[in-house]
């Protein structure tokens, strides 16, 4: 059995600090926003006296730009920001439900309610209308079903383009719309339990 290769990791963003900075002079940006070009050794001593580290933040500038800060705290803040960014950029999953051109009202309501739930959770959805055997001659029923789906899901999503045929299957994708979902959730919260869909 083969082992799966893991995706290459991005190199962690690191800065040169204190003795790692080996250029004759640097531009130091102070906490108040003022700047001054100093000899590297002199800037290092100033940072040491304040109990801080000299951190090179723009190594490509001429001379390189440094700031005085606590390196541990800076690294912690960067790691925290990276984690927050990863949380926010959670990849959306694609959920799919299948219909038939002769799907009855109860099945349509049941399946479209599931699609709506997936969209409210932030997932993309694909509705597939499967034409079995000779039912392909009823393409118009498939397109009617797509229009019903568009109408049913319009309060939480936007269709991605038009419905497309691929063999004996008709596909349409829906993308969640955060603003519409927020409005829908507020309306649901105002409803009495017996009025909720």
Swiss-Prot record:
Transmembrane residue ranges: none
Any one GO MF annotation of this record: ribosome binding
Q: Which UniProt key words apply to this protein? A: Cytoplasm, Initiation factor, Protein biosynthesis
Similarity comment text for this entry: Belongs to the IF-3 family.
Subunit and partners: Monomer.
Role summary = IF-3 binds to the 30S ribosomal subunit and shifts the equilibrium between 70S ribosomes and their 50S and 30S subunits in favor of the free subunits, thus enhancing the availability of 30S subunits on which protein synthesis initiation begins.
Q: Can you name this protein?
A: Translation initiation factor IF-3
